[in-house]
Amino acid sequence: ISIEEFKKNKKIIEKLKVKLTLFEMLTLIYCLSASKLKNVSYALVEAGLLYAKDSTRLWDQPKCQIITNINQQHLEWVKPKTLQAICQQKVGYLSKKTTIYIGKQEPKTKKIIKKILRKNPSKKIYYGDAWSLKKKGNCRIYKDKKGKLVLKSNKIFSDGIWQNVGLAVKVARDFNISKKN
């Protein structure tokens, strides 16, 4: 989104005279901008931590929902201050009519997520069951039922970012999104 388009959409929203949080304002600006795009098949929308009340809960039946690594970095935002509370906020309110991709988690976190999602009829695809990502030298080896891919980057130094890349590759492959897109 260009700065000009951002400012234009911000003015449109401000005319509504509706009190919005910064996150709600940014979400609405994104949605207005995305609605004007041509030849776009998918929109990636990142939800906030407190998904139960998140402004990105706009779609009843999204194509998919993606859960990246959940850890205790969000403790200050939830009550009670537990991993269970974080997981409940992140996965407890997901659509019941979608496919949910769950990235690599610590065993305790994965157990909590599975328990929360037990009542959700959506299809679930878990790291370790449907795909994996292994470090080999300076690259990563992605593997799923379609085969292996060698992923290389001299700009990614974080294992967490690599896990997100692997998760994105899984979704892209499942949706038959080509490498050039």
List the predicted regions and their residue ranges.
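Acidic, Mg2+-coordinating active-site environments of NTP-dependent enzymes
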Residues: 34-46, 62-181
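ATP-dependent carboxylate-amine ligase catalytic core
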Residues: 1-60, 69-72, 76-81, 85
